[in-house]
Curated annotation (Swiss-Prot):
A zinc finger (Integrase-type) spans 808-849. Residues 167-356 form the Reverse transcriptase domain. This is Pol polyprotein. The gene is pol. It comes from Ovine maedi visna related virus (strain South Africa) (SA-OMVV). The lineage of its organism: Viruses, Riboviria, Pararnavirae, Artverviricota, Revtraviricetes. Its EC number is 3.4.23.-, 2.7.7.49, 3.1.26.13, 3.1.13.2. Residues 39-110 form the Peptidase A2 domain.
């Protein structure tokens, strides 16, 4: 049975978990006399022992007793034969003295003797509600080894962990719970140790919960109250049990000091500090616990954020305090402690960084420090600005110049220059802060939010009476949003703030005219806006007049559209050389506007548009708030224009006499090759044909033909014909296109006829480039007359082209690339897939697109077999020693602790043992030029040269290798638990998976060169060591006479080859029939 486990006194590491046992709905407290003292105790049928905080030492002490609760074991003092009196009844009973208990309890041991019984109600309600948490799909929990700690830290940790275990916060983990999270500790100013847990990996793998509370409560949302009390919940997290199925993932290891014994493994039973869900679980738990209490006390204004509780009321002071006590008792039932020393009664009260006064509120620290002209470090500037941003809800001042000053160099020690304009901006904020105070909310009155366009920011004021703001705020510019759209975003933010803080929907006052805003809401994809809004004749600075009739810096787009040769066409030609045209149905006016829309879509932030349509020109110039736009093309253009920085609009009459306008008119008037459908890809300038796309997965059995219609109709010009051709990558696999001429004027669907010549089925996947369409000019020559009257037999049975795929290798290449992120060339060579397919795989890999490789640095460095370069590089806070062999590009790298000579020499011996190098180039770093390093190089026989100072070319190869290595490591850091593993994976990619122009990897080249050296040395050695022997030939198993001497031409493990002079044949002789001898003298003299 469970015992009520209390809290430790102040200064303890953490409190105990209270047992979630059953209690009555309103737990009864009764007066009993224990020894000589009267006490108000909780009658608790869930506790089997009676607990008091203090005792007068009457009765018989029987030593210490361990109480087992859900939170673990707590020790108290046990006293027998203590006189206990309830009303008239006196008994002798047993009590436990536990000074840290939040409440004193009469347990079942003495209740029966005193004849006390209670009727239970809502039996399960006072358990602490458990919030379910889980890992993300497919995750297995953290497995990060505990790093070594000093003896002193281990002793500090042991003391903390022992205490946690005794109080039931942690438990001993069974051996099959294998997860591990590292722990460490720091010393506080008081000299006590504080335990820290590195939950980063567990946090990554844990499924998020919704935030229980969005943002801080704000005093502007509070009503004015006579009395106020602020309570602080002590050891909040450590009072809430952790969901049991999740506990195995929270294990940590307590190393034994000096390795004198085995490690001890623990797991968390309560919400640990530093775990990402502790705040959310805590908030959900408090919501559940307090919901009923808040509902029963409507006269109380109640606010909670994490462990700070605000209670405000207009009751008389005695009643107010009684309710506060009631709340404290209610929370204490669940084991939460409310330390007396942190309780604040009455004004001024400090809450969440605010200072609450009877009529107003202000910030606790409401003066900003001065800033003076001169230099300031970025670190100090960030702190100052942070101080101000916190207070913007009171003063609403934006500081664009100071914010601009923070841009640039990110190093905290980098310096910034404060000028007079910055000082003035800051002083304005200081003055405003000194003058202003916030007001409380009156629920009888409406709430207004007024928005205005300030200096590079939008400011808004929330008020009920003019001049008495509840709060104000600033929303800074959002890139790529027009100012009007930004004002709408600010209105949404303001409304959400008011709803969260006050629970009412505000009236929003917007600058300008109502019609403008109706239009903005229509074209801006605004999904939600408060229904109560109005406009005031204030500033209309939001009107971003970015359409002008002057020339703008930027390219010029000549646009045109209309019915040309009976067909709707539109397009543009830009001064940059970009051209665009398209067939589309529509009126002349619609097509003119569509041409402008396409130019706006494809043009930059600043551009010029030239049109010969007066209608389109007037539309672009018109003040768009004059009417509500109903034409969807106009609305789309307005949306595009709002997002531009500036557009110059120009009108020229007709197309006569103006070369550029004539050009665009002619360009869209041509009967041009038009297409319909998505079965074709745009052609690059260097390609002969257009790639055709397979519409769905197609299986072609061995030796069979398939006709594949693709999603494409084309309209060839009269002087064109086309051919559907095979792609060489398909032909090389035995898959061919049969036929494929498309006659001029043909307008049918393109079909590709494919023949599989293999003896097994071939699959062409959907979306694969599998044929190409080649356009040719039509030349009739002598056959022109016949050509005019020719007939095409094909009708709708048109032809297209192909190129087939062996396909099985594509998924293999994709899978291998997801592991090693090699380049397209390497995939192409390793898996025999076309270069374009390999490039597609790399382009679709998000990791590779984020981490582009550096371009090659070409220098005149010395390169050669077994000649290496070495240097240190830094990745975040880690140091890596990088070696590169200059001939093959083979890289060797390891993480090091520092750039010391001793560590470098240890690494040098490792490097030498692995690669047997001959020479080394480094810069003039102290580790490289130290005398012991030079002596080691001589000892190993390595020729060591140092770079030419300030000549980067001398180290170009290793410098480029740094960049390549770091880019590759970046791809692997998230895939591996340890950084060293990420380095190793990067080396596999760069040394083994990366193929060069000849299809060889750095490792291939390095091994080949080593083998060549070995063969060369062996042949040299063999030439200088001829061997001679006597031999005998066996006939039917019987050995013959000894013959010779003769030269051994080849020697194996069990036999040799010689040439028999008599037979003029080469013979293989077993070694048992051979006697080796030194080189005979007479042969030497020959």
């Amino acid at each position: 049975s469970n015992i009520t486990a209390g809290k430790q006194q102040e200064g303890a590491t953490c409190g105990a978990v209270r047992a979630p046992y059953v209690v009555t709905e309103a737990p009864p407290k009764i007066d009993i006399k224990v020894g000589t003292n009267w006490k108000k105790v909780l009658v608790d049928t869930g506790a089997d022992r009676t607990i008091v905080r203090y005792h007068d030492n009457s009765g018989i002490p029987t030593g210490r007793i361990k109480l087992q609760g859900i939170g673990g074991i707590i020790e108290g003092e046990k006293w027998d034969k203590v006189v206990i009196q309830y009303k008239e009844k006196r008994i002798e009973g047993t009590i436990v003295v536990l000074p840290s208990s939040p409440v004193e309890v009469l347990g079942r041991d003495n209740m029966a003797k005193l004849d006390i019984g209670i009727i239970m109600a809502n039996l399960e309600e006072k358990k602490i509600p458990i919030t379910q948490v889980k890992l993300k799909e497919g995750c297995k929990g953290p497995h990060i080894a505990q790093w070594p700690l000093t003896q002193e830290k281990l002793e500090g940790l042991k003391e903390i962990v022992d205490k946690l275990e005794k109080e039931g916060k942690v438990g001993r983990a069974p051996p099959h719970w294998t997860c591990n999270t590292p722990i460490f500790c720091i010393k506080k100013k008081s000299g006590k140790w504080r335990m820290l847990i590195d939950f980063r990996e567990l946090n990554k793998q844990t499924e998020d919960l919704a935030e229980a509370q969005l943002g801080l409560p704000h005093p502007g949302g509070l009503q004015k109250k006579k009395h106020v009390t602020i309570l602080d919940i002590g050891d909040a997290y450590f009072t809430i049990p952790l969901y049991e199925p999740y506990r195995p993932y929270t294990c940590f290891t307590m190393l034994s000091p000096n390795n004198l014994g085995p490690c001890t493994r623990y797991y968390w039973k309560v919400l640990p500090q530093g775990w990402k869900l502790s705040p959310s679980v805590y908030q959900f738990t408090m919501q559940e616990i307090l919901r009923d209490w808040i509902a029963k006390h409507p006269m109380i204004q109640f606010g909670i954020y994490m462990d700070d509780i605000y209670i405000g009321s207009d009751l008389d002071i005695m009643k107010h305090r009684e309710i506060v006590e009631e709340l404290a008792s209610y929370i204490a039932q669940y084991g939460f402690m409310l330390p007396e020393e942190k309780r604040q009664e009455g004004y001024p009260a400090k809450w969440l960084g605010f200072e609450l006064h009877p009529e107003k509120w202000r910030f606790q620290k409401h003066t900003l420090p001065e800033i003076k002209e001169g230099t300031i470090t970025l670190n100090k500037l960030q702190k100052l600005v942070g101080d101000l941003v916190w207070r913007q809800s009171l003063i609403g001042k934006s500081i664009p110049n100071i914010l601009k000053l923070m841009e640039g160099d990110r190093a905290l020690q980098s310096e910034r220059r404060i000028e007079l304009r910055h000082v003035k901006e800051w002083e304005e904020c200081r003055r405003k802060l000194a003058e202003m105070e916030g007001n409380y909310y009156d629920e009888e009155k409406d709430v207004y939010g007024q928005i205005d366009w300030g200096d590079k920011a939008i400011e808004y004021i929330v008020f009920q009476e003019r001049g008495k703001p509840l709060w104000v705020n600033v929303v800074h510019n959002i890139k790529n949003l027009s100012q009007s759209q930004q004002i709408i975003k600010a209105a949404q933010k303001l409304t959400q703030e008011v709803i969260i803080r006050i629970g009412k929907i505000p009236w929003i006052l917007l600058p300008g005219k109502e019609e403008d805003w109706i239009l903005e809401l229509q074209i801006g994809n605004i999904t939600w806006m408060p229904s109560f809004w109005s406009c005031y004749r204030g500033s209309i600075r939001w009107k971003k007049r970015n359409v002008i009739t002057e020339v703008v810096e930027g390219p010029t787009y000549y646009t045109d559209g209309g019915k040309k040769n009976g067909k709707g066409s539109l397009g543009f030609i830009a001064s940059t050389g970009v051209k665009f045209r398209k067939h589309e149905e529509g009126t002349n006016q619609q097509l003119e506007l569509r041409a402008i829309e396409e130019a706006c879509k494809q043009g930059p932030e600043k551009m010029n548009i030239v049109t010969d349509s007066r209608y389109a020109y007037e539309f672009m110039r018109r003040n768009w708030d004059e009417e509500v736009i109903k034409n969807p093309i106009q609305a789309r253009i307005m949306k595009l224009v709002h997002d531009k920085e500036q557009i110059g609009v120009h009108w020229v009459p007709g197309h006569k006499g103006i070369p550029q306008n004539e050009e665009i008119d002619k360009y869209i008037s041509e009967i041009f090759l038009a297409r319909e459908g998505s079965g074709i890809l745009p052609k690059r300038a260097e390609d002969a044909g257009y790639d055709l796309i397979c519409p769905q997965e197609v299986c072609i059995p061995a030796g069979q033909v398939r006709k594949i219609p693709i999603n494409l109709r084309i309209n060839l010009k009269e002087d064109q014909w086309a051919m559907v051709g095979t792609k060489s990558s398909f032909a090389s696999k035995g898959v061919f296109v049969q036929g494929g001429i498309i006659d001029s004027g043909y307008q049918g669907i393109i079909q590709v006829v494919v023949y599989n010549s293999n003896d097994k089925e071939v699959i062409i996947p959907q979306g694969r480039k599998f044929a190409q369409l080649i356009l040719m000019p039509l030349i009739h020559e002598d056959l022109e007359a016949w050509g005019e009257t020719r007939r095409t037999e094909r009708g709708n049975q048109g032809f297209g082209s192909t190129g087939a795929y062996w396909i099985e290798n594509i998924p293999l290449a994709e899978e291998d690339h997801s592991k090693w992120h090699q380049d397209a060339g390497s995939l192409h060579l390793d898996f025999g897939i076309p270069r374009t397919a390999a490039e597609d795989i790399v382009q679709q890999c998000e990791v590779c697109q984020e981490n582009k490789m550096p371009s090659t640095i070409r220098g005149s460095n010395r390169r050669g077999i077994d000649h290496w370069q070495v240097d240190y590089t830094h990745y975040e806070d880690k140091i890596i020693l990088v070696w590169v062999e200059t001939n093959s590009g083979l890289i060797y790298a390891e993480r090091v602790k520092g750039e010391t000579g001793q560590e470098f020499r240890i690494m040098t011996i490792r490097w030498y043992g692995l690669f047997a190098p001959k020479s080394l180039q480094s810069d003039n770093g102290p580790a490289f030029v130290a005398e012991p390093t030079q002596l080691l190089m001589k000892y190993l026989g390595i020729t060591h040269t140092t770079g030419i100072p300030w000549n980067p070319q001398s180290q170009a190869l290793v410098e480029r290798t740094h960049q390549t290595l770091k880019n590759t490591i970046e791809k692997f850091v998230s895939m591996f638990a340890s950084f060293d593993s990420a380095i190793a994976a990067a080396l596999i990619t760069l040394n083994i998976k990366r193929k060069g122009g000849l299809g060889t990897s750095p490792m291939d080249i390095f091994i080949f060169n080593k083998e060549q050296q070995r063969i060369q040395q062996q042949s040299t050695r063999n030439q200088s060591k001829f061997r001679f022997c006597y031999y005998r030939v066996r006939k039917r198993g019987h050995p013959g006479e000894w013959l010779g001497p003769t030269q051994v031409l080849w020697e194996g493990e069990g036999a040799i080859v010689i040439k028999d002079k008599n037979l003029e044949k080469y013979l293989v002789i077993a070694k048992k029939d051979v006697k080796f001898i030194p080189q005979p003298k007479e042969i030497q003299t020959e």
